Every structure is written in C-alpha cells, then in structure tokens.
UniProtKB/Swiss-Prot annotation:
Compartment(s) of residence: Cell inner membrane
Name this polypeptide is given: Type II secretion system core protein G
Record flagged with keyword Glycoprotein: no
Gene name of the encoded protein: pulG
Gene3D superfamilies in the record: Glycoprotein, Type 4 Pilin (3.30.700.10)
Length: 140
C-alpha cells in the first residue's frame, strides 16, 4: 500500500498560527511607517513651497496674500496687489496636495511667522492637533 502525500490538518493549522503571530507583529510596524512617510511628504512639500514663496518675495517685495493663496506660485495673481516681476512659467508647475488629498493652506501674514503654510492633517479640520505647518518643522 502506498503512502499518500500531502499535509495533515495539524501541520496546516500550525502554519496558520505561525503566520497569524507574524502578521500581528508586522502589521502595527507597517502602520507606523505609513504615518511617518505621510508626515515626511508634508515636510518636503512645505520646504519646497517655502522656497517658492521666498522667490516670489524676492521678485515682488512681498508674499502673496491669504486671498491670493498658494495659487499665486503657479499663475500670476489677478487680485491686488499684483505681482510686478512674475516669471513666465510661474514659481512652481503645480501645487502639491497633502497625503490625505487636501490642498495646502497659506496664511499671510502668518500667526507663527511672516507666512504660515500648513496641512490640515489626517482629519482635515483646521486648528486641530494634527495640523502640520512650516512652524512645526523640526519638532515632534
């Protein structure tokens, strides 16, 4: 009589338990990395937007107003005060969105500096604890 090949039910159950234990250890670490990566993207975007705003100020002796917003970096603002020395291609090609699909916000003059650039964070609610702004860069 030939012996049948294959795995017993007990062997399969042991493998499933081991995979479950490994998954319970790995998944929480992956979730934390996603949050860190999202925050790092926001920081990178804020640094790039700050640089573009500084170039705007060098050319026009002022930052765009809150009403003109960050869109003033892509196309010349139509509202007063008009940009005097606006480059043909703008200061950036397009405005990035934060990792949660929202637009970055500009407050000029800012509450924390000359200009505040910020993301509303994961909850999308202004002035909540998860907002990330150019004034928080370097802080935990």
């Amino acid at each position: 009589m030939q012996r049948q090949r294959g795995f017993t039910l007990l062997e399969i159950m042991v493998v499933i338990v081991i995979l479950g234990v490994l998954a319970s250890l790995v998944v929480p670490n992956l979730m934390g990395n996603k949050e860190k990566a999202d925050r790092q993207k926001v920081v990178s975007d804020l640094v790039a937007l700050e640089g573009a705003l500084d170039m705007y100020k060098l050319d026009n002796s002022r930052y765009p107003t809150t009403e003109q917003g960050l869109q003033a970096l892509v196309s010349a603002p139509s509202a007063e005060p008009h940009a005097r020395n606006y480059p043909e291609g703008g200061y950036i090609r397009r405005l990035p969105q934060d990792p949660w699909g929202s637009d970055y916000q500009l407050l000029s003059p800012g509450q924390h500096g000359q200009v505040d650039i910020f993301s509303l964070g994961p909850d999308g609610v202004p002035e909540s604890n998860d907002d990330i702004g150019n004034w928080t860069i370097g802080k935990k």
